[in-house]
Amino acid sequence: MRKHIKNNVSWVGKIDWELQEFHGSDYSINNGSSQNAYLIEEEKTVLIDTVWKPHSTEFIDNLASEIDLNKIDFIVCNHGEVDHRGSLPALMEKIPNTPIYCTENAVKSLVGQYHHPELNFKTVKTGDSVDIGNGKSLVFVEMRMLHWPDSMATYMTGDNILFSNDAFGQHFAVEELWADKADQCRLWAEAMKYYANILNPFSPLVKAKVEEIQKLNLPIDIIATSHGAIWRENPLQIVEKYYEWSQAYQEDQITVVYDTMWDGTKKLAHKIADEIAKQSPDTRVKIFNISKTNKNDIMTEVFKSKAIAVGSPTVGNSVISSVAGWLDFLRELKFKNKKAAVFGTYGWSGESTKVLREELTKYGFSVVEPEIKCNWNPDADDFGKAEELVKALLA
C-alpha cells in the first residue's frame, strides 16, 4: 500500500481505476484517477490528506498496517472537499484528539460537512510553519480559489516537496505514481482537461499565485498532487504550463459545436468546418455534436481554440435544450479573448441565432456579424454564407 516518494515521505492514497465521473456527474473521467495522501515520518509523524469516503475502510486499514495510528502527531488538511476528506470522520473516531492543520475556511467546510466542531483544529495562513524535526518544517501557503476558498498547499523544507493539493493535478490513474512514467500524451491531455474544466474560471488567481510561488524562489524537487501523477522530473514544467494556460490561452484551432433535429443544422456545421479548412489549411478544426460528445471533452477543445462556431435549430422560440445546457456550462468557465460565430435552422420563428449571439456576447466572446440563419433545410445560398462567416472568424 505504501509507496516511497523521497526519504521519509510515502504515498498512502488510493488509485481508483474504475472511477468514471466526478463532482457528481459534472466531470467525466476516461482514464481513472487517484486520491493521493501522504505520510511523513520525521521526528514527528504527519498525515497529509486522506481519501474519498467509499475507500475509507481500506485506507484506514492499510494505514494502520503501516503505522500505529496513535503515533500520528497531526494531520494536514489542504482542502475540505470530500474526495480528500471523506475518510477523515472515520479516522478521527480512532484518533479523536489528533490536531488538524488547515485554513480558517477549511474549518468552516469541514464542520459544515461532517458536524464535528469539537475536533482539534489548528488554523494556519500563508507563511505559518510547523517544525517536524530533523531540521525540516512544513510551511503553509494559502491557495484560495484553486479551486475552493479553503484550499492551501504545504511545502516541506529539506526534501523540497510541494504538496499542491488540487493545483497541478489530473484525473488520471498512474500505477507508478510518477508523471515521467505515465503516457505523456494522456498525461498532458488530462492535465489540460482538468485546468479547462475546473480551474479556468479562476485563471487570474492562478496567474497571481504562480507569480507568488515564483517570487518565493523555493527549491522544488517534487510536486506531490492530490490527483493523478506526481511531478519529479523538471517539476516546474507543470507550473509553467499553468502560467501559460492562465493567460487567455489559445492555439490555432477553431471548434464547431452544434445540435440538430433533422440534420439541417448538422449540414451547416460541416459546411463551416470544410470552409475553415479551405480558407486556412493550417488551422486545426474540431467539430462536435453537443448531444453526442461529453461536455468536458468539448470544453477542453474550446479552451484550446481561438474561435468557436455554435449552432442550434430554433425550438420553443429559443435554442434546443442540449445547446441551452451546454451554454450554461460555457458561461461558468469564463473563457476570454475568443471569437465566436452563430448559425442555425428554423421552420417558423427563427430565434436561435439571436439567442446564441446574445448569450455568447454576455459570456465574453467577440461574436462576428456574419451568421447563417436558414429557413428549413439549407440550400446552396445558405451554404454560400459560410465563406463570409469563416472569413470573419479568421480575421
Residue ranges of predicted features:
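Metallo-beta-lactamase
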Residues: 3-7, 102-151, 208-209
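Active-site neighborhood of phospho(di)ester-bond hydrolases with catalytic His/Asp-centered motifs
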Residues: 48-50, 72-80, 100-103, 162-165, ...
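Active-site-proximal loop/helix segment associated with metal-binding centers of metalloenzymes
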Residues: 147-151, 159, 167-200, 246-250
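FMN-binding flavodoxin-like domain, especially the glycine-rich phosphate-binding loop
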Residues: 174-177, 184-223, 227-230, 271-286, ...
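Active-site metal-binding motif and surrounding structural segment of the metallo-beta-lactamase
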Residues: 54-101
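Short acidic active-site motifs
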Residues: 87, 293-298
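Terminal amphipathic helices with adjacent charged low-complexity linkers/tails
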Residues: 225-251
